[in-house]
Amino acid sequence: MTATTDRGLPGAPCWVSLLTGDLPAAQEFYGAVMGWSFRPGTLGEDFSVALMDGKPVAGIGNVARSMGVAVSWTSYFAVEDADTVAARIRERGATVAVGPLSVGHGRAALAADPAGAVFGFWEGETLREWSIGHRGAPAWLELRTRDAFASAIFYGEVFEWATGRPDRCEVRYEDDAVMVRGQGHTVACLRGGGIEAAPDPQIRPRWHVYFCVDDVEKAVEAALAAGGTVAAAPHDSWVGREASLRDCEGGLFTVTGARG
C-alpha cells in the first residue's frame, strides 16, 4: 500500500482485483477499454496496480493459473481480524478457499458464500483515497444471487453489518434489494429475487464489479477490438446505461455511465 493508508471501515469493500492468467494481455486489454495505466505492485512481478488519472483503481494479479481458479474480478472487504472472519464463514457452512495468508503488510483470504459467490477479505491498511464511487474506483459492487435476504444474513453476520455500531456498515431494504451503506454512502448492493420471493435457480451467484466510463457503446467497441466479448449488450438499467463484458481471458465486468 502507499503512504496514504488507514485501516478502512470494517465490513466495507476496500479493493477489487482481477485474478488473471496473463498479466501483459490483461494490461493491454484494460488499457484499451478503460484508459488505465499501470505501475508495478508491491507484491512482486506478477502484480500490478491499475491507475486512472494517477489514482489507484484496481489490482491485477497473474495468479489464476497458479491458484487453480477462474479468471475473475474479486471484491475484497476490510476486516479487523482475518482469522475471526474466516471462522465465522466456516461456521455458516461457507468456504474459505485460500488463506488467510500474509500478503505485504496485511493478510488476505479468498472465500465463497453459501451460494457459491466468491469474495475476498483483507486485514491491514487500505488505500485512503479508494472508495466506491469516488476517484476512479469502481462505481458500484453488486452481488447477484438467488436469495438476497439469505445472503444479507450471511454477510451481515460475517462482517457485522447492521449491528448499530457507528464503525460498521448499515443495511437498508429498497426495491427488493439489500443496500449496504457505510460512512454516509452506498458501498454495495445485494440483489436477487424479491426479498420474500422464492430463490431464482437460474442465477449464478457472483459479485459484479461496475466501472464507470464516459460512453458505454464506445467501451463495448473497444472491448471487441481488444479481443473481448459482450455478455450483455448495452441497455438502460435501474442505475443507468450499462453493458457487461468479458475480457480476453473471460473475466466478467460491467461498464456503466452512472457515476456511483
Model-derived segments and spans:
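Active-site-adjacent scaffolding segments
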Residues: 41-132
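Core segments of cupin and vicinal oxygen chelate
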Residues: 2-3, 7-10, 14-55, 91, ...
